[in-house]
Design a protein with these regions (language model features):
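The feature marks the mature, well-folded catalytic cores of soluble enzymes
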Residues: 1-239
C-alpha cells in the first residue's frame, strides 16, 4: 500500500472571536447554575454539547427564557432582539465577536448618515440577521450583485460584508455593484468588514489545495467558516 502523507493547513482551528466566546461562557458556567444562549454560542455541535454538559442550554426565542443569565452568541444580534432581552430584565453576557461588533457599528453609522445599506452575505445567517437590524429600514442582504441594480436604488448607497465571506468574492460583488449602480447612485461607500483571521484560513486552505490530491475540511456543516473553506478548495481538489 502506498504511503499516504497528511499535511495540515498552516492556519487552522477556531478563530479568535469563537475562542473568546467559548472562554467567556465556560467561565460563566463555572460560576452560575443557569445560563441560556440565544441560539448556539458557535456553529459547532461538539462545543454546544460540551457546554450543555456544563449546564448551558440554547434557546431560539427570548420568550423561552425563564430567568437567570442569557448569553448573546458570537454572531451578535439585532438591536430589536437586544431590547426584547433587556425588557425581561435578565443579566446579559455578550460574547459578540469584536469583528462582528465593528461590522454592526459600520452598518449603524451608514444608516445614521442616510445611506441605504447593502450587506454582502447570507440573509438567513444569524450574523447577517443581526447586521440587518443595525443597518436600519430598507437594508438588504444578498450574494448576488445583479439584485442591487433591480432595486429602487437610493442616492447614497453603503456596502458592508458578512465577516466570514471571501475577500475575492466580496471584491467581485462590489465591482458588479459599482458598474451597475453608478448611473443611479450619487454616492457609494464601501466598508471592508471582513475578518482578516478568516481570510488567512482561506488563503491557507487554497495554498494546501493546490498541492493535494484530497482535501478534508473538518468542521460543522452549518458553520459559515467551514463552508467557505470547502468552497475555496473544492474547485481545485476533491474536498
Amino acid at each position: 500500500m502506498a504511503k499516504v502523507e497528511v499535511e495540515k493547513a498552516r492556519e487552522l482551528g477556531f478563530c479568535l472571536g469563537v475562542r473568546r466566546a467559548i472562554k467567556i461562557i465556560e467561565t460563566a458556567a463555572r460560576e452560575h447554575q443557569e445560563i441560556a444562549t440565544l441560539g448556539p454560542i458557535v456553529h459547532n455541535q461538539m462545543v454546544v454539547t460540551r457546554l450543555a454538559d456544563m449546564g448551558v442550554r440554547a434557546v431560539t426565542e427570548p420568550d423561552q427564557l425563564r430567568g437567570g443569565i442569557i448569553a448573546i452568541a458570537s454572531h451578535g444580534i439585532s438591536p430589536e432582539l437586544l431590547s426584547q432581552i433587556q425588557a425581561r430584565q435578565l443579566r446579559v453576557i455578550d460574547t459578540t465577536c469584536p469583528i462582528v461588533r465593528s461590522a454592526q457599528k459600520a452598518a449603524q453609522k451608514l444608516s445614521e448618515l442616510g445611506f441605504g445599506v447593502v450587506i454582502y452575505g447570507e440573509a438567513t445567517h444569524p450574523e447577517v440577521k443581526g447586521l440587518l437590524g443595525w443597518a436600519g429600514t430598507g437594508a438588504i442582504a444578498t450574494l448576488d450583485g445583479k439584485e442591487i441594480a433591480a432595486l429602487g436604488l437610493p442616492r447614497r448607497l453603503g456596502i458592508i460584508s458578512q465577516t466570514t465571506q471571501s475577500h475575492s468574492q466580496f471584491a467581485e460583488f462590489t465591482n458588479k455593484v459599482i458598474n451597475d449602480a453608478f448611473p443611479y447612485v450619487r454616492e457609494l461607500r464601501i466598508i471592508n468588514t471582513l475578518c482578516q483571521e478568516t481570510q488567512k484560513r482561506q488563503e491557507a486552505a487554497l495554498e494546501l489545495a493546490v498541492k493535494s490530491e484530497l482535501m478534508i475540511v473538518v468542521g460543522w456543516h452549518n458553520s459559515a467558516n467551514t463552508l467557505r473553506l470547502a468552497q475555496v478548495s473544492s474547485p481545485i481538489v476533491e474536498s
